[in-house]
Amino acid sequence: MDDHLYRRRAAERALDYVESGMAIGLGTGSTASFMLRGLAARLADGRLQRVVGVPTSEQTAVLARELGIPLTTLDRHPSLDLALDGADEIDPHLRLIKGLGGAMLREKIVAASAARFVVMASVSKRVERLGERSPLPVEVVTFGMPLCIRRLAALGGEPVLRCDHSGAPFVTDEGNLILDCHFGVIADPEALAAAICAIPGVVAHGLFLGMASLAVIAGPDGIVELECPDASRR
């Protein structure tokens, strides 16, 4: 079966955790797009009512408006009931690599603002150890780029400036740049996260550690739901 189908199935199952009256975080990326379309359908047919969403990117905001999903802000809803988003890699402890969609800063803020963070993914995103397949995105301010490149390389990464389809540097919604860092398998994600955060000029990184409450993963054998007993929020 098609990987797109698995992502759509995971998104549909994750929507079962949304209840009427909730304020929720709306993720960014292909799986999140399936979730947005499913959410719009449930709002349109009355299965859900009075749901408002905080988008994690301008891209998500545009699609949500097109679909008629009511939007809000963290100023109005600083505490969210739920956040739904995809992931680029998921390990057995529900530690994640995110950010290939370029929205990891807002995604992390929204996930941290939610009582529960539910990750939706196809089985292709499951790994034994983070870094097996994906680079680690690191968002940096333009002024700090040279320093960040040196420091990230010293940590064992191979930083590559992300560019858009035209070949120009990719610019995030916050006006920053992204270095896709190829570390290979990450032996100690917590230590690496701390080291990256200590680099002046780094705004955010794509390691989401201890944040996911539940992962909804779809594959050829159906859907599995993995809970993380040591997540910071249940």
Swiss-Prot record:
The keyword Isomerase applies. The keyword Isomerase applies. It comes from the Bacteria. GO terms for molecular function: ribose-5-phosphate isomerase activity. Belongs to the ribose 5-phosphate isomerase family. Homodimer. It catalyses: aldehydo-D-ribose 5-phosphate = D-ribulose 5-phosphate. GO terms for biological process: pentose-phosphate shunt, non-oxidative branch. Its EC number is 5.3.1.6. This is Ribose-5-phosphate isomerase A. It is an enzyme of class 5 (isomerase). Coiled coil: none annotated. Catalyzes the reversible conversion of ribose-5-phosphate to ribulose 5-phosphate. NCBIfam families: PRK00702.1, rpiA. Disulfide bonds: none annotated. Keywords: Isomerase. Pathway: Carbohydrate degradation; pentose phosphate pathway; D-ribose 5-phosphate from D-ribulose 5-phosphate (non-oxidative stage): step 1/1.
